[in-house]
Curated annotation (Swiss-Prot):
<keyword id="KW-0275">Fatty acid biosynthesis</keyword>
<dbReference type="GO" id="GO:0009245">
    <property type="term" value="P:lipid A biosynthetic process"/>
</dbReference>
<feature type="domain" description="Carrier">
    <location>
        <begin position="2"/>
        <end position="77"/>
    </location>
</feature>
<comment type="similarity">
    <text>Belongs to the acyl carrier protein (ACP) family.</text>
</comment>
<dbReference type="InterPro" id="IPR006162">
    <property type="entry name" value="Ppantetheine_attach_site"/>
</dbReference>
<keyword id="KW-0443">Lipid metabolism</keyword>
<dbReference type="InterPro" id="IPR009081">
    <property type="entry name" value="PP-bd_ACP"/>
</dbReference>
<dbReference type="Pfam" id="PF00550">
    <property type="entry name" value="PP-binding"/>
</dbReference>
<dbReference type="InterPro" id="IPR003231">
    <property type="entry name" value="ACP"/>
</dbReference>
<keyword id="KW-0597">Phosphoprotein</keyword>
<comment type="pathway">
    <text>Lipid metabolism; fatty acid biosynthesis.</text>
</comment>
<keyword id="KW-0444">Lipid biosynthesis</keyword>
<comment type="function">
    <text>Carrier of the growing fatty acid chain in fatty acid biosynthesis.</text>
</comment>
<protein>
    <recommendedName>
        <fullName>Acyl carrier protein</fullName>
    </recommendedName>
</protein>
<keyword id="KW-0596">Phosphopantetheine</keyword>
<dbReference type="GO" id="GO:0000036">
    <property type="term" value="F:acyl carrier activity"/>
</dbReference>
<dbReference type="GO" id="GO:0000035">
    <property type="term" value="F:acyl binding"/>
</dbReference>
Length: 77
């Protein structure tokens, strides 16, 4: 679990251009980390590539925070 969590935080920081220290499990991509809708699409694509999964558009809309991403990836890998 820790490795998935760490990798997701690294991807979020890289995709959104923020310091990894700002990325907490509770961080909302839009509200806390300044992402816009295009950023979130690119973030989902990066997660799909990293973890070799496909995230449906419906599920992608539900992934709004770092913890949402951790939970989704953990449940689907």
């Amino acid at each position: 679990m820790a490795s998935i969590e760490k990798r997701i935080k690294e991807i979020v920081a890289e995709q959104l251009g923020v310091d990894e220290a700002q990325v907490t499990n509770e961080s909302s991509f839009m509200d806390d980390l300044g992402a816009d809708s295009l950023d979130t699409v690119e973030l989902v694509m990066a997660l799909e590539e990293e973890f070799e999964i496909e995230i449906s558009d419906e599920d992608a809309e539900k992934i709004q925070s770092v913890q949402d991403a951790i939970d989704y990836i953990t449940d689907h890998t």
